[in-house]
């Protein structure tokens, strides 16, 4: 992408070679993003989810001694952002935003619900009951199933002696009804019109704003060598 917007061409881009170069880079960057977004999935990639891409917004400011880039990267960890120079006057900023979720359409009966967690309650556990038998004298006698109790005791003993295995915790059942934040991979390229000092470049990420300061290289001064 060109370093300066199109409105900059008329006021400061007096050199036609720089103007054509900026426009060429800008058009190529736009074409590349469109091709990546509309490429069909064929073959083995049919069942894989395509990588989502987005383009963060940047402001570029020029001073007498530096170029300043300010980009919006909300919710991105600094470890997921890479800044590098591909040539002496071109800087590339790329990164990735990840979020695991399951998207869906909210049903009408749960309108307004943002997340759905938990599982349906299981039916009430069946409890053993005591049966009443009536003897010949019409007296109620409580009977217990001795054989069943012995069988239960054996099962408990077997469970106690068997080695216990740790169960993996289940992932929370969460579902996003609305997903509007940008996620995926991003890459921005800026080409500077003049020489820059790559060794003095500094960058910081605070409150979702990436700030990159690129000092301009000192102008080459002519040095005269005296002949003895």
From Swiss-Prot:
sHSP domain location:
49-228
Annotated GO biological processes are:
cellular response to heat
One matching Pfam family is HSP20
Q: Which SUPFAM superfamilies match?
A: HSP20-like chaperones
InterPro entries, A to Z: A-crystallin/Hsp20_dom (IPR002068), HSP20-like_chaperone (IPR008978), Small_HSP (IPR031107)
Q: What is its main location?
A: cytoplasm
UniProt keywords (A-Z) are: Cytoplasm, Stress response
Give residue spans, biased composition: Low complexity. 144-158
User: Which residue ranges are recorded for the region named Disordered?
Assistant: 34-53, 117-136, 144-174
Q: Which GO terms describe its cellular component?
A: cytoplasm
Record's subcellular location: Cytoplasm
- Other observations noted: The N-terminal putative helical domain may be the site through which HSP30 binding to mitochondrial membrane is regulated.
Q: Which family does it belong to?
A: Belongs to the small heat shock protein (HSP20) family.
Query: Would you tell me the protein name for this molecule?
Result: 30 kDa heat shock protein
Naturally occurring in which organism (per UniProt)? Neurospora crassa (strain ATCC 24698 / 74-OR23-1A / CBS 708.71 / DSM 1257 / FGSC 987)
The gene behind this protein is hsp30
